[in-house]
Amino acid sequence: MWALCSLLRSATGRTMSQGRTISQGSARRQRPPKDPLRHLRTREKRGPSGSSGGANTVYLQVVAVGSRDAGAALYVFSEFNRYLFNCGEGVQRLMQEHKLKVARLDNIFLTRMHWSNVGGLSGMILTLKETGLPKCVLSGPPQLEKYLEAIKIFSGPLKGIELAVRPHSAPEYKDETMTVYQIPIHSEQRSGKHQPWQSPERPLGRLSPERSSDSESNESEPHLPRGVSQRRGVRDPSLVVAFICKLHLKRGSFLVLKAKELGLPVGTAAIAPIIAAVKDGKSITHEGREILAEELCTPPDPGAAFVVVECPDEGFIQPICENATFQRYQGKADAPVALVVHMAPESVLADSRYQQWMERFGPDTQHLVLNENCASVHNLRSYKIQTQLNLIHPDIFPLLTSFPRKKEGPTLSVPVVQGECLLKYQLRPRREWQRDAIITCNPEEFIDEALQLPNFQESMQEYRRSAQDGPAPAEKRSQYPEIVFLGTGSAVPMKTRNVSATLVNISPDTSLLLDCGEGTFGQLYRHYGDQVDRVLGSLAAVFVSHLHADHHTGLLNILLQRERALASLGKPFHPLLVVAPTQLKAWLQQYHNQCQEVLHHVSMIPAKYLQVGAEISSPAVERLISSLLRTCDLEEFQTCLVRHCRHAFGCALVHTSGWKVVYSGDTMPCEALVQMGKDATLLIHEATLEDGLEEEAVEKTHSTTSQAIRVGMRMNAEFIMLNHFSQRYAKVPLFSPDFNEKVGIAFDHMKVSFGDFPTVPKLIPPLKALFAGDIEEMEERREKRELRQVRAALLSRALTDDLEDGEPQQKRAHTEEPQSKKVRAQ
């Protein structure tokens, strides 16, 4: 054991010495882990809601400005609570990037059951669960509870977090910071006798009515999780919920110096009841003299109110204007409204009725507008990294689109501010706009930063020389197919890598998506800008590999935005072909029943029917498969089951011209994928984890970098693109010794065609120079992990040796004892 301790000490010394050479920060003492329930315990100590005397600091902050790619979302902060108003796709990613702590969210308020408001909610809830948050209160339209049931179809049971749903008809909600009142508002355009729209009793699984007459069989019916209703639902697009939020009274601050001047016993136990009395507004008597509360305290803050209202179209204007609850806060109200947040299009803001309603709040009320006319960069890190990558290769790493404000809004007679990402309005201690946190996107600054990195310019020059000196291609390859990586990260959207989505542009007017994680449309929009409608109009199909949230929760927004794009292009609407596990039907059906009509958007081909040897009993499915092959000009679209979760698929696309693209989805190394992908032109394979984490890869059913490369080599793939990296490799993964001239790594917004295969591996040296600091940190973490593994292995071996050595010694003692006696006897 002494030798073992000595060995461990020497190994530790060597590694720590190396660590300090790489980064002096590694020698720092690690902080103890935080208690995940510390916030809850702090709240319990404060006592009942509203008894704390009011928050000292309260502000609203814009998370998303209402633009087409980001939706509208607000974050409200106090030292006691955190709130989120609306949670569309990408909100979690923005909060993570801009350090708005997700783990502290007490409440989520939803103004409408529309995908632009709830598209990121499923991912947000899963993240809150993982952070250990014990409870989150959700408020909004009546369909909210059914929506939370529906997401269990792909999330599984949401154990470990209590999701308390507050009905829109419930009385006010009160906590330590404020009281929130919900105001249901119904549009004038409600059909019939003003009853919520009833969804048709369409059988579960029949997605496109015009195509579903003979497309179903009993085996294709998806099974819903326990507790998820199969009954038809009641969705009500005519309902929005507005919120009036009233801050609690904040008692005045005790003036210590003034108290000393008046001879009060400051610094003794006797001062406590005096402070309590004057903060409650009571006078006190000291040495025969009456002292008024205002002599010892600053004036109390009665607590301002703010309003969050969504007015989606002109049909809601009159009901909003006539609402009696709003009227109580207008004019000479007892509780003045400091701020009204308007989630409303320009057509609503231009309506004279709505303008008059805004004016009735008075000249001292500020107004914040969130809509598609707001211009703001949200994903700053994404813009930064793309600008720097563009220096290496402008075609493979094209610049992202920036969006100026589209047009001047209507002239209003009230104080109006257009939303910008991270713009703040402080309600307490002083009411004011704060613009210091607003994002500014400065490409010149990003470029200068990259050019000053050690060896970056030299590595770029070396790459360009090697590209010029390399052998000329035997033949010029076509621009198509063109592969655009929209999301290359795994699990959750992060600041530099979004979750899975890859666009395959088969031709200038035909494309398909391989997986469609949350925020896919936003990535498309930032990549293509004003051309996004053209791209959506050319989208022929979507392949969903499996039902994990990071692979399919962007589908609904793609469907809705595609309908809008076809209308703007003047093209006839037709359902989108979706190749997916059958279980996706249950999710689409539930969302259709409770929230929005979406079933008419989809013609679904169960992925199992595209496996080799699959029997297709439905003529309708056969027709859809034929349509898929014809539209995409494919000879074959094949799927196979891969080694991940249940019903997880990979796919292979064989074009009529002969090229073959294979997509792994999520999987461990898989023989079925190797066989399906034989002689592929391009393999896109997940490489979630670095080499050395093979056990973790098995536990999580993913692949390491070298495992993915070996799959491609066994497949005899012409080229391998690695993607789906763990978010621990935020900017760049660790490079494996197995990297060669046939391997490249994918980045978000990277664009490659087959003619780029010789170029992509040559990008690795400048990439290493650009991300040298990140690579050093990852290598340091790997060294520490390897040291822990060596320690554990040596300790285990030493303990085993001790156990094995102990028994023979005892046996020898027993067997040698008689012999020694004989010797002594002689």
UniProtKB/Swiss-Prot annotation:
GO cellular component labels: mitochondrial nucleoid; mitochondrion; nucleus
Q: Which UniProt keywords apply?
A: Endonuclease, Hydrolase, Metal-binding, Mitochondrion, Mitochondrion nucleoid, Nuclease, Nucleus, Phosphoprotein, Transit peptide, tRNA processing, Zinc
Query: Which domain of life does this protein belong to?
Result: Eukaryota
Q: What is its EC number?
A: 3.1.26.11
Mark out the compositionally biased spans (Basic and acidic residues): 208-224, 808-820
Record SUPFAM superfamilies: Metallo-hydrolase/oxidoreductase
- Region Disordered, residue ranges: 15-53, 187-231, 798-826
Q: Which reaction does it catalyse?
A: Endonucleolytic cleavage of RNA, removing extra 3' nucleotides from tRNA precursor, generating 3' termini of tRNAs. A 3'-hydroxy group is left at the tRNA terminus and a 5'-phosphoryl group is left at the trailer molecule
SMART domains to which the protein is assigned, alphabetical: Lactamase_B
Q: Does the record bear Cell wall biogenesis/degradation in its keywords? A: no
Task: Give the EC class as a word.
Answer: hydrolase
Cofactor(s), names only, from the UniProt record: Zn(2+)
Q: Does the keyword Metal-binding apply?
A: yes
Carrying Phosphoserine, the residues are 199, 208, 212, 229, 618, 736
Which Gene Ontology terms describe the biological processes this protein takes part in?
Answer: mitochondrial tRNA 3'-end processing
According to the UniProt entry, its GO molecular function terms are: 3'-tRNA processing endoribonuclease activity; metal ion binding
Report the transit peptide positions: 1-16
The entry describes its oligomerization and partners as: Homodimer. Interacts with PTCD1.
- Report the sequence similarity comment from the record: Belongs to the RNase Z family.
Q: What is this protein called?
A: Zinc phosphodiesterase ELAC protein 2
The organism named in the record is Macaca fascicularis
